[in-house]
């Protein structure tokens, strides 16, 4: 109605006071309800500048992460407040097994108006696999280039994710760049509302530096270059995650399980290198009491498929060596896990693997460009 470029949203209601002065619109005392999220604040549109300039200072007492899903073409998983187009997108993703939606983004809106918008979300309601509890950011759009900086997300347990996002939409094929760092994030919070929560412990550090091009999230990830690095200095994971693959896989990985279904972890780390949408596992390992697990392989973000192997190297004496690897293949959304060729040898095996120098390797992994 006012010609303001904005993102697609779930159903919304807005109340407030609209003020008009020569060349200036002000929307004050505003209250917004977007999907299940709320916003309050002040919006100003200055028509005297060319292009027009929008300034907004917004606060949310409750921000439901799924209400941001339309920004990347995704659909909320909830059953209410979902448009027919969003529901169709979700059905297509589930049917194809794809991880990223290929819904074109309306980038032309970024060129229509310059903006300076801040949002302080006091409470974030996120999916169980994303342990964000609050966030604040500033979005500045100048001549088709959108910069989200600073971006800060507070995580359950005291951890944070900080960094910046940039989208250059001056051309028809936008360029997207992200640089984020994560620190002191409790691993178990990624498994909220699951049976793995109680047996999972440890704190994660990480760094994400990715750049890609495209008009949809699937296209951007399918052309991405850069890396994602993660490290866990110690803790435990639930043995139930591994047991889903069957007893043979459990034996092949040579894992020690405590009485409360924990697998003690001395160290874990991994680096995913992205090159034109192809992801390669680099220095990806899990150091446990009885063995060191090494992951090798690759994934394609164009076909959204993965093919990887996990090889266990024993640290000590064992009566049986399965001489096999665990294979992970299929769509990223739902891969299959199974054993490669296995040759049981009924002879004692003396393992030679050593503990990983966790602190030094973690420093190298997260410091690398």
Show where each model-derived region lies:
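Acidic, Ser/Thr- and Pro/Gly-rich intrinsically disordered regions
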Residues: 1-106, 122, 130-177, 181-199, ...
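Short sequence motifs at beta-strands and strand-loop junctions characteristic
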Residues: 8, 129, 200-202, 262-265, ...
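Extended terminal
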Residues: 17-23, 30-33, 37-50, 56, ...
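Outer-membrane beta-barrel architecture
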Residues: 53-55, 112-116, 175-177, 221-227, ...
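Outer-membrane beta-barrel and related beta-rich outer-membrane complex signature
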Residues: 68-72, 236-245
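Interface/linker segment at the passenger-translocator junction
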Residues: 77-111, 120-124, 341-369
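Solvent-exposed, glycine/polar-rich loop segments of beta-barrel outer-membrane systems
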Residues: 242-255
């Amino acid at each position: 109605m006012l010609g303001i470029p904005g993102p697609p949203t779930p159903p919304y209601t807005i109340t407030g006071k609209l003020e008009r002065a020569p060349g200036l619109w002000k929307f004050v005392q505003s209250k917004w309800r977007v999907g299940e999220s709320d916003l309050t604040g002040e919006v100003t549109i200055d028509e005297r500048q060319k292009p027009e300039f929008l300034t907004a200072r917004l606060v949310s007492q409750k921000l439901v992460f799924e209400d941001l899903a339309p920004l990347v073409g995704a659909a909320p998983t909830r059953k209410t407040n979902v448009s027919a187009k969003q529901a169709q997108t979700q059905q297509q993703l589930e049917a194809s097994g794809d991880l990223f939606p290929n819904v074109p983004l309306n980038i032309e809106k970024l060129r229509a108006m310059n903006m300076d918008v801040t949002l302080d979300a006091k409470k974030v309601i996120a999916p169980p696999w994303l342990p964000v509890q609050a966030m604040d950011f500033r979005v500045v759009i100048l001549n088709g280039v959108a910069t989200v900086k600073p971006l800060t997300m507070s995580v359950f347990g005291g951890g944070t994710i900080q960094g910046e996002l940039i989208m250059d939409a001056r051309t028809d094929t936008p360029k997207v760049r992200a640089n984020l760092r994560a620190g002191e994030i409790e691993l178990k919070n990624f498994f909220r509302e699951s049976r793995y929560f109680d047996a999972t412990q440890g704190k994660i550090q990480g760094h994400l530096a990715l750049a890609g091009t495209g008009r949809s999230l699937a296209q951007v990830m399918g052309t991405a270059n850069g890396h994602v690095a993660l490290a866990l200095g110690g803790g435990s994971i639930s043995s139930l995650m591994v047991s889903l693959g069957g007893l043979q896989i459990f034996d092949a990985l040579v894992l020690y399980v405590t009485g409360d279904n924990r697998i003690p972890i001395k160290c874990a780390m991994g680096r995913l290198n992205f090159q034109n949408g192809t992801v390669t596992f680099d220095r990806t390992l899990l150091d446990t009491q009885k063995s060191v697990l090494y992951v090798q392989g690759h994934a394609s973000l164009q076909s959204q498929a993965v093919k990887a192997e996990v090889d266990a190297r024993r640290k000590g004496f064992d009566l049986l060596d399965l001489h096999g690897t665990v294979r992970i293949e299929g769509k990223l959304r739902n891969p299959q896990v199974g054993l490669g060729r296995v040759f049981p040898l009924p002879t004692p095996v003396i393992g030679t693997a050593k503990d990983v120098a966790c602190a030094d390797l973690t420093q190298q992994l997260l410091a690398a460009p």
